[in-house]
């Protein structure tokens, strides 16, 4: 085991803060409508240009192990916020840095870090309550477009595309983002269905870049039993191979020699296949399989209907124009089902929703209706170059996450105003002076997102913050055009979920940093350049001349 270096107290915290600052300073330049780009080196190909906080954070790895620990903890803030809300990663990083910076002053002054943490937690809980009170539902297409535009770095066309997609497929529908073929963004609405099961083996992947298996014009075999014996599958595999089309198998499970044979056939190119577990459990699984059968115009192989794998023909298999299978999701696009049958199935499920007694059952039934009736919207991102397309695609994905978050928990005024208004309404007290200091740390940190937005726009932060604090309600500063006014009317909106997640995750990690008193890291080994030094003995080789 390698020797470890152990550092205590202020020395440990100072190193960690250095790491926090390096990462946060790199990320926060991207904040706001006038935020700058960050260029990331790639080991091959063109560098990536991004304004996405979490993409920048993930690239940073510091040489100094102690500094790197601090940087990695703040990276966790960005990653967790991205996972929870899909956006707000830069805001979360800015808040974390501010809480750490303010908190370290109090720790250095001798205050109890644990009480500071309790104060921070109290202030965050109170702020979350205030944000929920400020938030208003996001219902109109215009509001959805505004949220999308802000999240896509003030690109109105992206916001409009997302709002249009949501309007077409409903808030429950599936929206995916793809590379476009032209210079402009396009929106395609495709009838389809998505369920949360992915490929059973990574050997089915045929698109390494997206890590997905894509089947064009496939047959679909639906079975409500476990398949482990390849002999059961042989008749249907032979029929599909003769037809020269791919096959997707959706069953309770596929294992053993059946799965191995499918994988081998796929790798050798004899038969393009993919195997997926059926979604849901128990009765819900049977119902979901029936939904897929109706959508694809096939039949479920089940004992109840007298169908077995040996007897099934191509006519009883479902069909679709295209199927995309990822690690966790399968999207079935343009199934071969009859519109009348699908409509009848939707009516049947809606009747079940009326009779459902539990909220959980109702929610699951509504999901099924959305999957049958909603369809899939595909936003095709257009750009002049591949580098621009990658950057734009990342922004579209961010904006999509933000709009979903807005629909879920409502919207608050953007541009850092929501945190300032929530701060003004907080009237809590700590149990002792150290907890009071913890509350003050959070209240001060809540100014930081606005300060950073203003700074990136090239204005004087203190002047703008003071003016915004004088105002009330939605009054704030629009950095895009340098004007003051009602943020909601100007269309500068943030999803409440994004602001809440950013603050909670930032405070959680920052409080851990403040309460750290010891760091343990491997001692860096001096890699001596030696080894070649003994070659001096080779001088005797001169005598080799006599060999001639």
Curated annotation (Swiss-Prot):
**Protein localization:** Cytoplasm
Q: Which Gene Ontology cellular component annotation is one that this UniProt entry carries?
A: cytoplasm
Name a single GO biological process: protein refolding
Q: Which reaction does it catalyse?
A: ATP + H2O + a folded polypeptide = ADP + phosphate + an unfolded polypeptide
Which sites bind ATP? 30-33, 51, 87-91, 415, 478-480, 494
EC main group: isomerase
- State if ATP-binding is listed as a keyword: yes
What is the first-listed, main subcellular location in coarse terms?
cytoplasm
Q: Which family does it belong to?
A: Belongs to the chaperonin (HSP60) family.
Q: What is this protein's function?
A: Together with its co-chaperonin GroES, plays an essential role in assisting protein folding. The GroEL-GroES system forms a nano-cage that allows encapsulation of the non-native substrate proteins and provides a physical environment optimized to promote and accelerate protein folding.
Its assembly, as annotated, is:
Forms a cylinder of 14 subunits composed of two heptameric rings stacked back-to-back. Interacts with the co-chaperonin GroES.
Protein name, per record: Chaperonin GroEL
Instruction: Specify the species.
Output: Janthinobacterium sp. (strain Marseille) (Minibacterium massiliensis)
């Amino acid at each position: 085991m390698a020797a470890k270096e152990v550092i205590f107290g202020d020395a440990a915290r100072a190193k960690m803060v250095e790491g926090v600052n390096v990462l946060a300073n790199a990320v926060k330049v991207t904040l706001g409508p006038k935020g700058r780009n960050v260029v990331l080196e790639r080991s091959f190909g063109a560098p990536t240009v991004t304004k996405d906080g979490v993409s920048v954070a993930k690239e940073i790895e510091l040489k100094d192990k102690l500094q790197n620990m601090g940087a990695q903890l703040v990276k966790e803030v960005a990653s967790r916020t991205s996972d929870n809300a899909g956006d707000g990663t830069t805001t979360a990083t800015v808040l974390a840095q501010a809480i750490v910076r303010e908190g370290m002053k109090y720790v250095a002054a001798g205050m109890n870090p644990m009480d500071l943490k309790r104060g921070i937690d109290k202030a965050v809980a109170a702020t979350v309550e205030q944000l929920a009170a400020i938030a208003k539902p996001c219902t109109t297409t215009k509001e959805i477009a505004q949220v999308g535009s802000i999240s896509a770095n003030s690109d109105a066309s992206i916001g409009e595309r997302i709002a249009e997609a949501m309007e077409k497929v409903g808030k429950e529908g599936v929206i995916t983002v793809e590379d476009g073929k032209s210079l402009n963004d396009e929106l395609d609405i495709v009838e389809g269905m998505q369920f949360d099961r992915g490929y059973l083996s990574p050997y089915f992947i045929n698109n390494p870049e997206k890590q997905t298996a894509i089947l064009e014009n496939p047959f679909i075999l639906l079975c409500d039993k476990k398949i482990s014996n390849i002999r059961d599958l042989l008749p249907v595999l032979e029929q599909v191979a003769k037809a020269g089309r791919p096959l997707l198998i959706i069953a309770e499970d596929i294992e053993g020699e059946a799965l191995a044979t499918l994988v081998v056939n796929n790798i050798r190119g004899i038969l393009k296949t993919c195997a997926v577990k059926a979604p849901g459990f128990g009765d819900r699984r049977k119902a979901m399989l029936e939904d897929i059968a109706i959508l694809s115009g096939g039949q479920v192989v089940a004992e109840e209907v007298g169908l077995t794998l040996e007897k099934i023909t191509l006519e009883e298999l479902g069909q679709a124009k295209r199927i995309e299978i990822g690690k966790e999701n399968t999207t079935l696009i343009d199934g071969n089902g009859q519109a009348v049958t699908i409509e009848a199935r939707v009516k049947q499920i809606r009747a079940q929703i009326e009779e459902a007694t539990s909220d959980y059952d109702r929610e699951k039934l509504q999901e099924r209706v959305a999957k049958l009736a909603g369809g899939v919207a595909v936003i095709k991102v257009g750009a002049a170059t591949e580098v621009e397309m990658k950057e734009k695609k990342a922004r579209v994905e961010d904006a999509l996450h933000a709009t979903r978050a807005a629909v879920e928990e409502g919207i608050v005024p953007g541009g850092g105003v929501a945190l300032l208004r929530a701060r003004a309404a907080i009237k809590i007290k700590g149990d002792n002076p150290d907890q009071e200091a913890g509350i003050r740390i959070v209240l001060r940190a809540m100014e930081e997102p606005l300060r950073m937005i203003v700074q990136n726009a090239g204005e004087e932060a203190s002047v703008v913050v003071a003016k915004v604090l004088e105002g009330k309600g939605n009054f704030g500063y629009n950095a895009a055009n340098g004007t003051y006014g009602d943020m909601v009317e100007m269309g500068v909106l943030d999803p409440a979920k994004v602001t809440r997640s950013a603050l909670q995750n930032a405070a959680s990690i920052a409080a851990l940093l403040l309460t750290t008193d010891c760091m343990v890291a491997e001692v860096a080994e001096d890699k001596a350049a030696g080894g070649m030094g003994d070659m001096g003995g080779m001088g005797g080789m001169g005598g080799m001349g006599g060999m001639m």
